[in-house]
Amino acid sequence: MKWNMNLISRDDVKTKLDRKDSFKLVMVLSEWAYRSKHIPGSMHIATPEEALARLAKDDDIVVYCSGYNCIASVNAYEYLVRHGYTHVRRYAGGIIDWEEAGYPLEGEMVREETNA
């Protein structure tokens, strides 16, 4: 099935975070990848069943994974829409795009910057 996917840009995600908008930013990669680095404010969801349990159908949801070629966020988007979630968007650029912009990350693999 071909989806007309709702996308959100890097700058729009950053604006939503800066404004402290009420939305669920969901990283759909492995637990290891999430612990290594993720966008601040993200939650990790490992399975479709966990998504259904932790997300309400009327939540404002943004799913992302590693980058433009990562299919995990496409699959998560399609799964949620198929299950009646009405406010789902995909941040296609993911971690790679976010990091290239110099935006902050959290996690065990994030280098701490020294501001001297």
For every predicted segment, state its role.
Residues 30, 48, 94:
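A generic "binding-loop/recognition-motif" signal
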Residues 42-48, 86-90:
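Short hydrophobic/aromatic-enriched beta-strand-loop microsegments
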Residues 43-44, 61, 105-109:
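Short, hinge-like loop/turn segments at secondary-structure boundaries
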Residues 18, 23, 45-67:
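Mobile, glycine- and charge-enriched loop segments
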Residues 55-99:
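Catalytic cysteine-centered active loop of the rhodanese-like fold, especially the PTP/DSP P-loop
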Residues 34-40, 52-56, 98:
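Short loop/helix-cap segments at secondary-structure boundaries that form the rim of catalytic
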